Every structure is written in structure tokens, then in C-alpha cells.
Amino acid sequence: MTKRALISVSDKSGIVDFAKELKNLGWDIISTGGTKVSLDDAGVETIAIDDVTGFPEMMDGRVKTLHPNIHGGLLARRDADSHLQAAKDNNIELIDLVVVNLYPFKETILRPDVTYDLAVENIDIGGPSMLRSAAKNHASVTVVVDPADYATVLGELADASQTTFKTRQRLAAKAFRHTAAYDALIAEYFTAQVGEAKPEKLTITYDLKQAMRYGENPQQDADFYQKALPTDYSIASAKQLNGKELSFNNIRDADAAIRIIRDFKASPTVVALKHMNPCGIGQADDIETAWDYAYEADPVSIFGGIVVLNREVDAATAGKMHPIFLEIIIAPSYSEEALAILTNKKKNLRILELPFDAQAASEVEAEYTGVVGGLLVQNQDVVAENPSDWQVVTDRQPTEQEATALEFAWKAIKYVKSNGIIITNDHMTLGLGAGQTNRVGSVKIAIEQAKDHLDGAVLASDAFFPFADNIEEIAAAGIKAIIQPGGSVRDQESIDAANKHGLTMIFTGVRHFRH
């Protein structure tokens, strides 16, 4: 009995050569629509789908393969006499191979001119149904959704006239992933269209971006997946201009870095980061000076770190960065001279180019945190804060310079691991206390790090001070201005301590925990 394949693809890469080889192996080919036209034009003889169904394509192609002559041919078990008899009684011929990929729904909704009606018309119905039928009956039917699998299938058919069960099972799993991801993307689109903030089912599609050597540690296996609907401002979308492949830890650190720099849009800014904590942030009228400040903030910790700049990297800035061992540099662009400097004898330095004009779109994405047996979902911490809404709770008002420095510090503290303390002036970070289990411990660490630069410095805390001992430590170090959320039942004790030492203190009313 001549074996039959059904081919209906939107991605026609390689399909003509594949179909020609099938014909050479003695297969009949059923096809539909544009695929049939392409194969016929290439001289590949095909059978029209309506010759199989006895029913014409209708409703602008919405109904063409949803027919017992198709699905019976796919689903009939070859080891079940009753199935084979039912097929014979109803003149259903068996189909042994299905090659289908689906209407380009993703590509359609990514078009800037897409309309709702166009998106709906690009939801495939018959394709997923055929794939699921073929995949369910993989004991006998081979299902192919990816042109990358054409060679394997043809090779096995040429060798043994059929594919192996192992291959059919693998391809069935791939087909089910394909249809599941397709439906998840449609669900994601419709959920957004109706503004459903808390859907009872969460379905998000990710595509494999990179198989990684290992994860956070060498004993951990890892991979990097990119959202099927990508954000341009993301490490997954960055263009790598130089260097080794990004590691698991590189990607996490780089992601943290590009989140921080989003809050410093107005002025040229450089962020240096290590282990997802900023070790230096510098802000100036030009990017070279901003680099100087970020480097001077902690010239020890920046070694082996990640640097992100929010302006084009020029030759002067590149010349200062080049002698330092850095893992990654990220910027919106690089001058030709800068790129030549940075890549000179630095073949491993990872240099990434990222479209900073897409930052706003990245801020609306939800954050996902895996826990054992579950997933936490939250909005990003991108609340708009207006300094005019902040409250000075002490007798002394901040000076103009202190106010500027406090705004800078408040932007920076949001990205320090809790319990987080940061000491800055109006243009650079000076000391950092991160990740301590008590707040006064973070205060002491930050003061120790900044001890030689405390003249005119200010301090920010990501959450309220639970006791006045924090204020006493700060005052003893000579720091005169504090910014914190407030909200402790002992706030008045902290206010009284600040007044006693002549400090100025602002309550923002917004906490910025970061775990």
C-alpha cells in the first residue's frame, strides 16, 4: 500500500526538497492552499485536500481539514482491527506522515499595523487539530513541525521505509509543545486584550535562546529562554559585539544592571554591578566623567564586574575601561574608535549593544519568582515618585545640595539587596551595606566603606529604621541627611534622635525591599 503524507506549512523553507524526496521514496502527498501551489509549481505532484474529503475548502479557508477522512486517517490504530475495519467501511485511507506548521500568529501580532480582526484570522484551527491527532497516534504516524527535522525523517524513511518509534515519540513531544505554546500565546494575547489582571490560569510561552554550560554553579544544569513576545530592552534581545557566550550568572547580573540604569535617564550615568548589587553608580554631564565616578565609588569591587552606560561609549571612556578586567559592558551604542579600543586584546570581554529607547515597554512586564511547587508574580517596582510628595519630618530642612543627593540616593537604594543601605553624594555612590539580616549591620558596613568620603554625604535606607540606634550610628559618622520610607511604630524615636543631632530626614512613604 502506498504511504501518504499530508503537508500544509506556513514556513516553506526546505519543503520542496523534502516533498521531492518523499515522492522519490514512493509516497503520495496530500496538500492544501499555498503549500499545494508551491509544490505544484516546483513539479511535485500532489493530491488536493478536497479530493480526500470530498468537500470543498470553504469560509475563506477556515474549514478544509476538519473532516473524518483526514482525522480518521490520522487516528486509526494500525494494531486495532476494529479501527482498520471502520476506516475501510467509510472509505478512509490512512495517513502516515503529517508535516504542518501553523498560521503565523506570533509574527502577525508583532506587526505594528496589526488589527484585532487580523490577529483573529491568524489563529490556526485545523493545523493544531491535525498535529494533535498525529501526535496522539505516534505509534504509527510521524508528525513534523520543524524543518530542522526533515533530514532525520528522510534518512530513516530511506533506510527502513519508516521512522523509528523513538523518533516518532520525540517528534510527538515536540508537536505537543508546539501546539501548547501556540495556544498559550493566543491566550496571552486575548488576556491582554480584555485586561485580565489575575487570570485563573497563567500560560506564558518561552523559546530556547541558549543552552548553557552550567547554571549558578558548575553542578547545576541550566538553559536560557526568551519570551515568545520579546521585549527589545532585555538581555535576551541584546546584540553581542564581542566576547564569550554569556553565562548564567552573567545574564542575571546584566539584567539587574539594565534595570538600575532605567531610573537614571536624565543624565549620563554609569552603573557598575557585582553579584546583582550596584558597587558603583556615577552621574555627570558627560559619560566619561560618569565612568570616573562609578569607578571611584569602589575600584576594588568593580574588578570582574558588569558595567552599563546609558550614553554612547566614546574613545576616551573606552580608554579608561580597557585596562580593567570587566565581564560585560552594556551600552546603547559604541563609537568605531571605542569598539576598536575595547576589543584590542580583549577577545573574551562581552560587549553588548541594547536599544535604550525601548526601556519604557520593559517596565510593564511582570516579574516571576519560582518557589518550590509554585510561582510568585508581581509588578516591577517602578512606582512613580514625586519628591514634592515626600515629607521632611525633622526640624531641619535639607539644603539644596542635600536634596539633590537624597534624590540620587533614593534612586540607587531601590536596587540594593535588603536590608539595604547606601551612602552617596549628589553624583556618585560612596558606600553600600547590602543583604544583612539586621539594618544596623548594613548601616555599619556602608559607613565603613564610605568612611573617607563622608563630608557632605547622605544616606538612604530601603525600609524604615526599626530603632533609633541606626540614627545614632549615622550621626556618629558625621552624615547629616537621611532618606527612608518611614512607617515604623518607633518612627518618632528616630525623628527625635535625628533632631537631637541636627540631622535632616525625609520620609518617602514608599518601601523598596529587594530580596
Swiss-Prot record:
GO MF entry, a single one: phosphoribosylaminoimidazolecarboxamide formyltransferase activity
GO CC terms in record: cytosol
Record-level GO BP terms: 'de novo' IMP biosynthetic process
Domain called MGS-like: residue spans: 1-145
Family as reported in the entry's similarity comment: Belongs to the PurH family.
Record remark on domains: The IMP cyclohydrolase activity resides in the N-terminal region.
Protein name per the record: Bifunctional purine biosynthesis protein PurH
Organism in which the protein naturally occurs: Streptococcus agalactiae serotype Ia (strain ATCC 27591 / A909 / CDC SS700)
